[in-house]
Swiss-Prot record:
Ranges where the RNase H type-2 domain occurs: 16-216
Subcellular location: Cytoplasm
Protein name: Ribonuclease HII
Lineage summary: Bacteria, Pseudomonadati, Thermodesulfobacteriota, Desulfovibrionia, Desulfovibrionales
Recorded superkingdom: Bacteria
Reaction(s) catalysed by this chain's protein: Endonucleolytic cleavage to 5'-phosphomonoester
Any one GO molecular-function label of the UniProt entry: RNA binding
Role noted for this protein: Endonuclease that specifically degrades the RNA of RNA-DNA hybrids.
Species whose genome carries this gene: Nitratidesulfovibrio vulgaris (strain DP4) (Desulfovibrio vulgaris)
Record carries keyword Cell membrane: no
Ranges in coiled-coil conformation: none
Entry's family note: Belongs to the RNase HII family.
EC number: 3.1.26.4
Length: 220
C-alpha cells in the first residue's frame, strides 16, 4: 500500500534531504503538463515563498529566479498533449515528475509530492540509483506548507506559462498567452470557432471533436 497522504508535515517529521515535487497544467485543455523537482539547502532566503497559485505573475517570476539561484539542484519535466492523450493525464503527470527528478544533479533520497498520490512502482523504479529507490510521501496542500514543494510549484508554473506564451505566437486565435490553456469561456469559444490545434488534448471534454466519444477526466 502506498503511504497515506498527510495534510501537514511538521518540520521535525521531514527527512533531512528531499526533493519537493509539484506540477502545473494538469487540468488544462491545451499545452503540456509540467513538473518541477527542487532540493533546497538547509538555509536560504526566499521571502514570500508559498503556493504559486497565491502569487502574482510578477512575484512568481521574481521568486523563480531566486529559487534557481539558491537551490541545491532543480529540474523540470514536460509531457506534451500527444502523450497525454495516449497514456492519460494521471500517467502523464507521473511521467513529468519522474523526468524532473531524473535531471537533478544529485539523486534525492526522498520525494515529497504535492497532492494525494505518490509515484506508482513502474514509474518509481525508473529513479533507481545504485539499486536504491527514493522514499516518497504525498502531502495534501504541500505546496502551501513545505517550502521545497512551494518552490517546485513556482518553477513548474513559470516555465509552463512561458511555454504557453510561445505557443500563442505559433497557434493564433486561441488566446494561449491569456488563459494558458485552461478551459475559459474565451478558450472554449475559440475551439468551437477554429477547431482544436496540435496543442489541444483531444481526449478532454470541451476539446474532443465528438462529444459522445470516451471522456478523459482529470484523475487528480
Amino acid at each position: 500500500m502506498p503511504p497515506r497522504p498527510q495534510r501537514l508535515a511538521p518540520v521535525a517529521d521531514l527527512p533531512p534531504v528531499f526533493a519537493g515535487i509539484d506540477e502545473a497544467g494538469r487540468g488544462c485543455l491545451a499545452g503540456p503538463v509540467v513538473a518541477a523537482a527542487v532540493i533546497l539547502p538547509q538555509e536560504y532566503t526566499l521571502p514570500g515563498l508559498t503556493d504559486s497559485k497565491k502569487l502574482t505573475a510578477a512575484r512568481r517570476e521574481s521568486l523563480a529566479e531566486g529559487i534557481r539561484s539558491c537551490a541545491v539542484t532543480w529540474g523540470l519535466g514536460v509531457v506534451w498533449p500527444r502523450d497525454i492523450d495516449r497514456i492519460n493525464i494521471l500517467q502523464a503527470t507521473f511521467r513529468a515528475m519522474a523526468r524532473a527528478v531524473r535531471v537533478l544533479r544529485q539523486p534525492p533520497p526522498a520525494l515529497l509530492i504535492d497532492g494525494d498520490k505518490t509515484l506508482p512502482p513502474h514509474v518509481l523504479t525508473t529513479l533507481s540509483c545504485d539499486g536504491h529507490l527514493p522514499t516518497q510521501r504525498a502531502i495534501i496542500g504541500g505546496d502551501g506548507c513545505i517550502p521545497a514543494i512551494s518552490a517546485a510549484s513556482i518553477l513548474a508554473k513559470t516555465f509552463r506559462d512561458r511555454l504557453m506564451d510561445t505557443l500563442d505566437r505559433r497557434y493564433h486565435g486561441y488566446g494561449f498567452a491569456k488563459h494558458k490553456g485552461y478551459g475559459t469561456a474565451e478558450h472554449l469559444a475559440a475551439i468551437a470557432a477554429h477547431g482544436p490545434c496540435a496543442q489541444h488534448r483531444l481526449t478532454f471534454r470541451g476539446v474532443r471533436p465528438n462529444p459522445a466519444a470516451e471522456e478523459q477526466l482529470t484523475l487528480w
